[in-house]
Amino acid sequence: MASSHGPKKSLGQHWLKDPDILADIAEAAELTGDDVVLEIGPGLGTLTSRLLARANSVTAVEFDADLARKLPGQFPGKKLTVVNQDVLQFDLNQLPKNYKVVANVPYYITSKIVEKLMTAENKPSIAVLLVQKEVAERIAAEAGNMSVLSVSVQIFAEAELDIEVPRQFFTPPPKVDSQVVVLRTRNNPLITPEYQRDFFRIVKAGFSAKRKKLRSSLSGGLGIDKIVAEELLKNAGISPDARAEDLAIEDWRRLLKEWRAR
């Protein structure tokens, strides 16, 4: 039986079996009978069963060959496709438009998975991700607590925190608590593709020296004089004394506009 499969520490496996929490995660994806779901890391299939009950079909990408081999036999007659592959290598273009993602994400590849989903040509319409609580909070942060991660995600999607999952609900318990973050992909990113390179250069410069004021971090990160950095900020309606974490997405957009107008 699949349940006898012990979690592999090297793969960051932690089994979640609580039926109420699993139901809440599946519900967060707002599934209908027409939906195609990409499940990342199905593990023992405890969440898979709930997704199959709600969606049209599920494509489950599982890196662990032992688990991938066992999964299909657990759901005979169901529309389940199991792919034994590293999800970072999985071609999202195989999936139809407006597919949905549901995943209990291994902590060690969370940022890479989020980046893959948000920058893909074929993005999901919604991604429901169970991740480390601190990471979920960073992804969904607002002005005052922003980071490169939150800015990077929020130009592509609206981010909303959902249920918290304390560590004791996992086997074995991880060292930290988890939380569901729901990403609803924007029809159009807030920064168009041709400007994204400049945008991220500015954002990364702003966050390059977190404790410093923006005039200093932009000066160092962009290789410009502090006077020039201060002028850019003032023209964008931003206090030169502000710090990067204080800025909302709209502030960064105005700063990009001023940078390109130089």
Give each language-model segment a name.
Residues 222-225:
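Short amphipathic alpha-helix segments
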Residues 1-205, 227, 234, 245, ...:
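Catalytic cores of RNA-modifying enzymes
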